[in-house]
């Protein structure tokens, strides 16, 4: 049988080449760079706290391996910071970047390295969201949150000893980000049926599997447990791979993420991204007619927020975010359609007990 190839169906899938997850794997950073033939000057992007947690060790280990290093401390994930990083990388003739942190540093290194067309390595110090292995970067551009296509990390080095020592709130937020895959995939399927949008079965299956693993193990995800950190990190890496396979964030970002981004815009003090996505997933699963109680119960077992009070956000902002969510990404069709009415928003929030 002759195989016919449709060139228009070809997709570019960029995946991490090396993924190290486990106790003490940070010590392997020099070997990873040798394996990947990364030589010369390394620019380490980190924060004031994560520099002490892992950044200084990464610098020492790379210098022991024969690399020279420079370190940049970041404070905000903005396009201005990306521009500064690019300038620093050019001035120091950096041949590769490392993002060492819980999210911001990784996203900045990811985007700067993409624009400079040089590799970068992701070194997460917490497992709070799936950006640690994805080809998307979340930054503030012109005062608004933006999710920008970028390159996937060439390697991910996730030391569970470090990650399990981070505040448990970050790990619980990571679980919320993973569990949100369920409604993201349902939205994707809906867009495929109603708008004839491309739907990737394999990416969707991988995304669902990651969410299912977290829900089925919700009872065993506890603070200070490296086994919990390992499980969550692997699921977050799976999320990143699913998005790379799909060529978009569709497998892991739908109406629940739009709700979270709307909260970021309007709430005086937003919660963690994964926390907001988890609460959003409860409500969006209700709109899909699914088992929203299972989502809520899993988040409760994990210790993640399930309502506005636990998020530290007033009820009125939850309602306003529901009303605005559909407009966050007008090109992305979800269960929100053209938007909820005020009465519908209040109904879903009250029935799911997100507000009182």
Curated annotation (Swiss-Prot):
EC supergroup of this enzyme: oxidoreductase
EC number: 1.1.1.261
Main location: cytoplasm
Keyword NADP: yes
Positions contributing to NAD(+) binding: 103-107, 125-128, 134
Alphabetical UniProt keywords: Cytoplasm, Lipid biosynthesis, Lipid metabolism, Metal-binding, NAD, NADP, Oxidoreductase, Phospholipid biosynthesis, Phospholipid metabolism, Zinc
Binding site for Zn(2+): 177, 257, 273
Co-factor(s): Zn(2+)
Gene Ontology cellular-component terms listed: cytoplasm
GO terms (BP aspect): glycerophospholipid metabolic process; phospholipid biosynthetic process
Domain of life: Archaea
Gene Ontology MF terms in the entry: glycerol-1-phosphate dehydrogenase (NAD+) activity; glycerol-1-phosphate dehydrogenase (NADP+) activity; metal ion binding
Membrane-crossing residue ranges in chain numbering: none
Reaction(s) catalysed (UniProt annotation): sn-glycerol 1-phosphate + NAD(+) = dihydroxyacetone phosphate + NADH + H(+); sn-glycerol 1-phosphate + NADP(+) = dihydroxyacetone phosphate + NADPH + H(+)
Pathway where it operates: Membrane lipid metabolism; glycerophospholipid metabolism
Binding site for substrate: 130, 177, 261
Listed CDD domains: Gro1PDH (cd08173)
Subcellular location: Cytoplasm
Entry-linked InterPro entries: G1P_dehydrogenase_arc (IPR023002), G1PDH (IPR032837), Glycerol_DH (IPR016205)
Record's function text: Catalyzes the NAD(P)H-dependent reduction of dihydroxyacetonephosphate (DHAP or glycerone phosphate) to glycerol 1-phosphate (G1P). The G1P thus generated is used as the glycerophosphate backbone of phospholipids in the cellular membranes of Archaea.
Similarity section: Belongs to the glycerol-1-phosphate dehydrogenase family.
HAMAP family: G1P_dehydrogenase_A
Descriptive protein name: Glycerol-1-phosphate dehydrogenase [NAD(P)+]
Organism: Methanosarcina mazei (strain ATCC BAA-159 / DSM 3647 / Goe1 / Go1 / JCM 11833 / OCM 88) (Methanosarcina frisia)
């Amino acid at each position: 049988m002759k195989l016919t190839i449709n060139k228009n169906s070809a997709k570019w899938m960029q995946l991490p080449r090396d993924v190290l997850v486990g106790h003490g794997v940070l010590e392997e950073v020099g070997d990873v760079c040798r394996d990947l033939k990364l030589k010369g000057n390394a620019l380490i992007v980190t924060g004031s706290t994560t520099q002490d947690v892992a950044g200084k060790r990464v610098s020492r280990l790379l210098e022991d391996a024969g690399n020279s290093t420079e370190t940049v401390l970041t404070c905000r994930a903005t396009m201005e910071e990306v521009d500064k990083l690019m300038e620093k990388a050019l001035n120091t003739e950096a041949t590769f970047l490392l993002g060492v942190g819980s999210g911001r540093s990784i996203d900045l290194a990811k985007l700067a390295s993409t624009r400079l067309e040089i590799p970068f390595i992701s070194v997460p110090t917490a497992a709070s969201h799936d950006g640690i292995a994805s080809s998307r970067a979340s930054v503030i551009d012109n005062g608004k949150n933006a999710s920008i296509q970028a390159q996937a990390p060439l390697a991910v080095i996730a030391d569970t000893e470090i990650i399990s020592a981070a505040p448990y709130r970050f790990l619980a937020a990571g679980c919320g980000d993973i569990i949100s895959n369920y409604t993201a995939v349902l939205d994707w399927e809906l867009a495929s049926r109603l708008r004839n949008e491309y739907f990737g079965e394999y990416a969707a299956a991988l995304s669902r599997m990651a969410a299912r693993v977290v829900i089925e193990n919700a009872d065993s995800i506890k603070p200070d447990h490296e086994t919990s950190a390992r499980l969550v990190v692997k699921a977050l890496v799976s999320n990143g791979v699913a998005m790379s396979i799909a060529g978009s964030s569709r497998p892991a970002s739908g109406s629940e993420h739009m709700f979270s981004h709307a909260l970021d815009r309007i709430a005086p003090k937003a919660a963690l991204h994964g926390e907001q996505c988890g609460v959003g997933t409860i409500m969006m699963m209700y709109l899909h007619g699914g088992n929203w109680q299972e989502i809520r119960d899993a988040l409760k077992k994990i210790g993640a927020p399930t309502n506005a009070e636990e998020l530290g956000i007033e009820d009125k902002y939850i309602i306003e975010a529901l009303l605005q969510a559909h407009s966050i990404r007008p090109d992305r069709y979800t269960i929100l359609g053209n938007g909820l009415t005020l009465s519908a928003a209040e109904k879903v929030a009250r029935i799911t007990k997100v507000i009182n």
